[in-house]
């Protein structure tokens, strides 16, 4: 049976662009990267995190002041992989706008909230989910205790990040993340994860999710 990821990559369309040196072909994602658009799709794990971080650093080197647009459709994933993306978003100089298409769950919702203030968007039918980190550990009792303490430390840190970006109190975030909390786009806006729900682009020529 063929690897579904390999099958998917084989179906990625190519775009042909006319230049003064003739035709040049790009896969669609590389062409959109030229427009400073990054796609964060699928589970958040080390491989995907490395690619997103590399794209952020590349676009900063290209132009340290021009906005970067990040389109998010992710069920979440590995906390440390997500934090690598988060820290890079805060570290680089260009403002990063975020736009949720489909879903932003778990670490996906944190990265959605991590966009530049007033530049965090959601499409109207997107779903956002927040919750506390989870993990399963095996081994000696002492090791399990150490892992349990580490996940509590991560929980506290993630809560603090949500507090910083949403404007909610720590208690409100702690209560909201106690269980899976599913939000509509409007609810996510009211909660402070996004700034605006958009259903169309104000300027058709603009590559990123800019609105009037």
UniProtKB/Swiss-Prot annotation:
One of its GO terms (molecular function) is ATPase binding. Its main location: cytoplasm. Pfam families: CLP_protease. Keywords: Cytoplasm, Hydrolase, Protease, Serine protease. CDD domains: S14_ClpP_2. It is found in: Cytoplasm. The active site is at 106 (nucleophile), 131. GO terms for biological process: protein quality control for misfolded or incompletely synthesized proteins. It catalyses: Hydrolysis of proteins to small peptides in the presence of ATP and magnesium. alpha-casein is the usual test substrate. In the absence of ATP, only oligopeptides shorter than five residues are hydrolyzed (such as succinyl-Leu-Tyr-|-NHMec, and Leu-Tyr-Leu-|-Tyr-Trp, in which cleavage of the -Tyr-|-Leu- and -Tyr-|-Trp bonds also occurs). GO terms for cellular component: cytoplasm; endopeptidase Clp complex. Its EC number is 3.4.21.92. NCBIfam families: PRK00277.1, PRK12553.1. Cleaves peptides in various proteins in a process that requires ATP hydrolysis. Has a chymotrypsin-like activity. Plays a major role in the degradation of misfolded proteins. Belongs to the peptidase S14 family. Fourteen ClpP subunits assemble into 2 heptameric rings which stack back to back to give a disk-like structure with a central cavity, resembling the structure of eukaryotic proteasomes. This is ATP-dependent Clp protease proteolytic subunit. It comes from Rhodopseudomonas palustris (strain HaA2).
